[in-house]
Swiss-Prot record:
Family: Belongs to the SeqA family.
GO molecular function: DNA binding
GO cellular component, one term: cytoplasm
Region of interest: Interaction with DNA: 100-101, 129-133, 163-169
Annotated protein name in UniProt: Negative modulator of initiation of replication
Protein's cellular compartments: Cytoplasm
GO terms classed as biological process: negative regulation of DNA-templated DNA replication initiation; regulation of DNA-templated transcription
Subunit structure: Homodimer. Polymerizes to form helical filaments.
Alphabetical UniProt keywords: Cytoplasm, DNA replication inhibitor, DNA-binding
Gene3D superfamilies recorded: Met repressor-like, Replication modulator SeqA, C-terminal DNA-binding domain
This protein's record includes keyword DNA-binding: yes
Length: 197
């Protein structure tokens, strides 16, 4: 992997083209430039690398992964979360808040406070290819670099990175909300606060 420097405008454009959590700059540029994605399949795991064809083949160690079964939420629990999130979205304080990071933290706080177990499962599954988005301590997030700007989600034991653009914040929220089995209509309502007009 090579490192290149780009100006802020180009960086923001590339970041705005992100389609999924964990998508790297290389993945985004390959997609934008219509270049093929290099993949190889090992034991039903897909390994993606821009350097696959450039290096001699190496043995790849694949460790066994224990798949956790996630506990489905009851309709009552889902409805309770939906109600709490909608109450937050409709509050004057939230409506008047201009900072995306404050809105982001407020929504995460409500998700956690309404169903901590479901929130914990959701955040465990949300990680980028090279980055951890949520942790129970600041140090874990700082291991990826001081530039991650970790902040504690108010009234929770969780920390989250905040040096992301609004689009990435929404992808993180969307991933958590989908994992918590919340309806797409609610996710779309939240999305309206994180899209640039």
């Amino acid at each position: 992997m090579k490192i290149i420097e780009v100006d802020e405008e180009l960086y923001q454009y590339i970041a705005s083209q992100t389609r999924s959590i964990g998508e790297s700059a290389s993945d985004i540029l390959r997609r934008l430039l219509s270049l093929p994605v290099h993949t190889s399949i090992v034991n039903d795991l897909i390994i993606t690398s821009a350097e696959t064809d450039q290096k001699p083949k190496q043995a790849i160690n694949v460790k066994e992964v224990n798949i956790k079964t996630t506990k489905k939420q009851s309709i009552t629990a889902i409805n309770q979360i939906v109600e709490k999130v909608q109450t937050l979205l409709n509050s004057t304080e939230f409506q008047e808040e201009s900072k995306a990071v404050v809105r982001f933290l407020a929504i995460l706080r409500v998700l956690y406070r309404t169903n901590p177990e479901s929130f914990a499962q959701a955040t465990e599954s949300l990680q980028g290819r090279t980055r951890v988005y949520f942790a129970r301590d600041e140090a874990t997030l700082l291991m990826a670099g001081n530039h991650t700007k970790p902040k504690q989600i108010p009234d929770t034991p969780y920390w989250v990175i905040t040096n992301t653009n609004s689009g990435r914040k929404m992808l993180m929220l969307e991933g958590a909300m989908q994992s918590m089995e919340l309806p797409e209509t609610l996710i779309d309502e939240v999305r309206s606060y994180f899209t640039v007009n």
